Design a protein with these regions (language model features):
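Active-site-proximal, substrate-binding regions of enzyme catalytic domains
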Residues: 37-93
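Active-site neighborhoods of divalent-metal-dependent phosphate/nucleic-acid chemistry enzymes
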Residues: 73-126
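Structured helix-beta-strand junction loops
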Residues: 28-29, 70-73, 134
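Aromatic- and histidine-enriched alpha-helix N-cap/loop-to-helix transition segments
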Residues: 34-40, 99-102
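Short, well-structured N-terminal submotif of metal-dependent ribonuclease cores
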Residues: 1-38, 49-62, 136, 146-149
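Acidic, PIN/NYN-like endoribonuclease modules and their adjacent C-terminal/linker elements
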Residues: 1, 105, 109-149
Length: 149
């Protein structure tokens, strides 16, 4: 089982330089854990691509369908008071935005407060650094401009 943040899920939905590596990683362990808002965050990134003309309406429909298939199989960590407390702490000790702190807090909750027992997959350097400092083994995906998968 691995925790995937939104930046790591995106290469599974759109073609990026890291898509093959991300797909190999998910094939090696299909047990995916994500934060509750991951699907929304990914849909937002896809909408930015469509608005920026990097995607056609057809590309968008294909990507959203792919995202929905992934979402039907993953396990989501839902919002809780404990998760919020962790996120508040994380924004104070790491240079994270609120959404990234929620991602990392969700991973900590998923790991039952034992980060060394859960891999954290991300394409976000700042989030990766914070995750390492919190004790996670991080799988870093380097990304370039996305294109339709």
């Amino acid at each position: 089982m691995r925790f995937w943040d939104s930046s790591a899920v995106l290469p599974l939905v759109v073609r990026e330089r890291t898509t093959d590596a991300a797909r190999a990683l998910i094939r090696s362990d299909a047990a995916v854990v994500v934060w509750w808002s991951t699907q929304v965050e990914c849909a937002s990134a896809l909408a930015r691509l469509e608005r920026g003309a990097a995607f056609t309406a057809t590309d968008m429909a294909v990507a959203i369908a792919s995202l929905s298939r992934l979402a039907s199989a993953w396990h989501e960590i839902e919002a809780s008071d404990l998760l919020r407390e962790w996120a508040v702490r994380l924004v104070r000790v790491h240079p994270l935005r609120a959404a990234d702190a929620m991602q990392l807090a969700a991973a900590i909750v998923a790991a039952e407060m034992r980060p060394s027992g859960l891999e954290f997959v991300t394409a976000d350097r700042r989030l990766a650094e914070a995750a390492v400092r919190e004790g996670f083994l991080v799988r870093m995906l380097e990304t370039l401009e996305p294109s339709p998968a």
